[in-house]
Every structure is written in C-alpha cells, then in structure tokens.
C-alpha cells in the first residue's frame, strides 16, 4: 500500500468507519484479509459459525450472524461489501439498502482502491463478460497482451482474484478480468478501460429476478470508453440500443462472424478482418482457431478487437492465437481415431452454449443431459437436426431431451442411460457413442444442462468423458 491508513480514509470515506463484509466464503475471506491489511475495522456476517470463528482467528475481525445484523441495525457501519454469491434479495442486503447503507461487491471495492492509487498508479482494466465464452476470451486476450510485452494477467474468475492482482509483485499493469453478472451487479462505479460483452442468453434468472435485470447488469461493461459487443446476438443488440453513451464517446465496436462493416471486426474470405482499428487489416486465418467452431471464432474476434484497441499489431495477435491452448472442458479435443474426433465441451451447461459447441461440426454423435433447470431445449434440437446423427442421454432431465429429439429428429438412434453412478453412466454413454460414430463424425459432449445431478461439477463430468473416450475410441 502506497498511502497511509489516514490517507486511505480520506481517499475513500466509506472505509473510514467499520466495514461489514457479507459472507465468510472464499471471496469474503479475501476481502477481509485485504481490508485488515489496510488497517480497516471489519465485521464479517455469515450464518456459518465455524467459518466465522476460523476467519476471526486468521484476521482478527469481528463476526456476527446476519440475523443479528438486521435486528441490531446498521448504525455502526459505513459500507457493506458483499460476496458475489449473496443474492440481492438477501434479508441483510435488503435491510442495509433500506437503511441507506451502500452495498458494493468485492470487485467494486478493488476498483475503487485502484482508482485511488492505493496500490500505485492506476491499472488498465479490460473486462470480459457474457453468458458463454468468458473464460476462453479472457485467456485469449491475456495471452495476446502478454505476447505484446504488456505486464498483463487473466484475473477475476480465472487466474488470481482482483484483490490479489493489485498487490502482486512484480506488478500487473493490465488486468484482463473475467467478471460474472453477480460481480457486475454490485459494481456501481466500475468503468473499465475496455469492456467486452460477448453474448446474452437466459441464465441466473433466479438470482437477478428477471432476464432484463441480468442483461442490464452484464451490459454495464459497455460504459467503457472502448466498448466491444457481439453484434450477432439479438439480446446484445437490444442492450447496445438501450445504453446511452456519452456524447463524446466512441461508438460501440462490434464483432461478427459475417462481413464486417466499418467499425467492426469480422470474417471475410476465411480471414479475420479489422475494420475498426485499421482499414481492412487482415489479422489471421479463421482456420485452426481453438476451440473449433463458431464459439471459438467469436472468442478470438472479441479478444483480437480488444487487443487492437490497445494498439497491438496483427502479427502479434496471429502469433499469440496460434500458440493458444484452450482450457479444459471448453471444446478440447480429447480423442482422435480413424477420422473420428471426441470433443469435451462439458462447460456447455445451457442450450446457448451447446448451440455453439454443436455448430462447429457437420456430423455429430451428441452426448447430452443433466439438469436443464427449466431451459427450453426444442429450439436447439431443431437448429441442429441436420447434423445430429445419434444421441446419448444421461442425467435427471434426459427424458425431456429424448422427447424433443424423437419429435424433431425422428428415426435417429437414441440411448437413454438410466445408470445413476456417474462413472458407469458416462462409460455406457461413450461406449455406445463410439459404436455409432463413423469417419468424419465428432462425438461431442455438450450437455446443454448443469452437472450437479450426477457429478461434483462440469470438470468431473468432462474428465470422466475423456477417460471413457480413452478406453473406447481405439482399435
């Protein structure tokens, strides 16, 4: 910290009194440690008394139950810093706002500290959000920025937390931050230098209360001086129309899989073309970008546009993307034999993500199923009826998907796996899928559903898919 405690409290008056941290989980621990290191008085509220006791021993903070905070009142506090998992309708947060107390998130707090130069000169914030593709785009952009020579790092929901990133030595100058709608909801003053909104589809509606609120929270990144948005997505276009940018602000930069107009980045004749930060500048070939298919290409276009806005050359972008390796469970090729490929896209936990995953292949043996959480599946199946040749289904909502497949793609082979043991279920699905696949086919795990009905997470689901592929996709 480059300022004294007294100077900090002048720069950020909300930290001059006692700070109430909502949540003693991973995020709450990180924020409490940060605040205590800066000399702030902190009380942490959580219903888990064991976690509170542990945190109090670690940091010396005071602790309290959420119910006691609400009953005692908020007169002792100057601000609430909430963990992103706490919903806006949580009684403590509702009561705090009703009492006139500001509620902010962990990212917003760190942003204010950075703008106040508490940890040295202000950093460059490049924020990536969207329903799908955030992690891949963030990783791509961080790779490009690092290749350009910038002291950049992927932070936020991948890499290190933003709280750690502003204190890391050697210093990180460019924060390429993947942020969720939860984090953006509680960010009232965050205006990144570059903001990217990839896409929007139904997600986390139970947390936000409505799709409109979810979309508005995501679209906060478009307040950035350099705003970049996926113009092929109808919901994104609705938000770009709704947002009133400053009169002197540059127009929003669009990226598209089609022909780019002026002020856009897109694809022409198999090449990524920049018509926003150059005059028809060829960035690289669209072929060979990982992950394969429209999703990976969209991610690369968004990352390239953001890098170009920072003055990065086309040569640097081409070199960085050529060596980029996709993270696990996001379109990773986990097997290849006799012109059959196996693709792990376990991260495709909703129909929108599965749409992009399936679109990258002309003939697919589809492995799907899990918790649909009420998501509509018919449109996805109708869209890809011409490329799906067989379907293996597992998980709690497999019958819903099976009914849709039999309605919209009658006659294709369908396996419904009733086994509930996660490893045996995946093994059965994969063994059958391999038996259905022929040269030129892709066996694609793109569940279109959440994983927690059977697996500890989408990572375990993808790992078990890869293990089963290794056992069955061979001579």
UniProtKB/Swiss-Prot annotation:
Reactions catalysed, as given in the entry: UDP-N-acetyl-alpha-D-muramoyl-L-alanine + D-glutamate + ATP = UDP-N-acetyl-alpha-D-muramoyl-L-alanyl-D-glutamate + ADP + phosphate + H(+)
The protein's name: UDP-N-acetylmuramoylalanine--D-glutamate ligase
A GO CC annotation given for this chain: cytoplasm
Annotated positions binding ATP: 130-136
EC number: 6.3.2.9
Pfam family, one: Mur_ligase_M
Keywords, sorted A to Z: ATP-binding, Cell cycle, Cell division, Cell shape, Cell wall biogenesis/degradation, Cytoplasm, Ligase, Nucleotide-binding, Peptidoglycan synthesis
Described function: Cell wall formation. Catalyzes the addition of glutamate to the nucleotide precursor UDP-N-acetylmuramoyl-L-alanine (UMA).
Disulfide bridge partners, by residue number: none
Functional pathway: Cell wall biogenesis; peptidoglycan biosynthesis
GO biological process, one term: peptidoglycan biosynthetic process
GO molecular function: ATP binding; UDP-N-acetylmuramoylalanine-D-glutamate ligase activity
Subcellular location: Cytoplasm
InterPro entries referenced in this protein's UniProt entry, alphabetically: Mur-like_cat_sf (IPR036565), Mur_ligase_C (IPR004101), Mur_ligase_C_dom_sf (IPR036615), Mur_ligase_cen (IPR013221), MurD (IPR005762)
Family: Belongs to the MurCDEF family.
Major location (coarse): cytoplasm
Class of the enzyme per the UniProt entry, highest EC level: ligase
